[in-house]
Amino acid sequence: MAEVDALGEFKHGVALLNNGNPDLALPCLWRAFECERLNPSYLSFLGLSIARAQREWDQAARLCEMALQINRNEAVFYLNLAEVYASSGSRAKALKTLDAGLEKFGDDDRLRGARRKVEKRRSPFIPLLSRNHFLNRKLGKWLHKVSKRKRKNKT
């Protein structure tokens, strides 16, 4: 019986969160979490709600990180943790989290979109030309590949 109530509270909390009401979502998600403290979905969305409603970045990040440690097979857990990191100003951690998600799930549109929102765009390779000019696009992609390869070799 507690599971059904927890699931109902969770679904209601997520709906409130998605509708831009983190303050109202927080008690629902908290009640779901109290029923099942190791449920990664409850942990992740409670963390996201705490971040949005209370701006308690450390607590929110810990909850989202725990969810991801328990279950790495849900793209939404990467998205929630990345949002918490980005909101707290930890852009590098957010990008690292999204990259890990993209590596695990391939070309997931939600992860790609979140990464685009978080990343800072570099200035065009040739500033005199527009960002959409074919030379800037080709050289930018080449530079990105080279820098990605260098980062991979460092680790």
Regions found by a protein language model. Give the residues of each.
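Amphipathic alpha-helical segments within well-ordered protein domains
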Residues: 30, 48, 82-83, 98-102
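Alpha-helical adaptor scaffolds
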Residues: 11-18, 27-76
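Structural signature of tandem alpha-helical TPR/SEL1-like repeats
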Residues: 19-28, 53-66, 88-100, 125-129
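Intrinsically disordered, low-complexity, charge-biased linker/tail regions
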Residues: 1-11, 15-18, 69, 103, ...
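Mid-chain, well-packed structural core segment of small domains
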Residues: 67-92
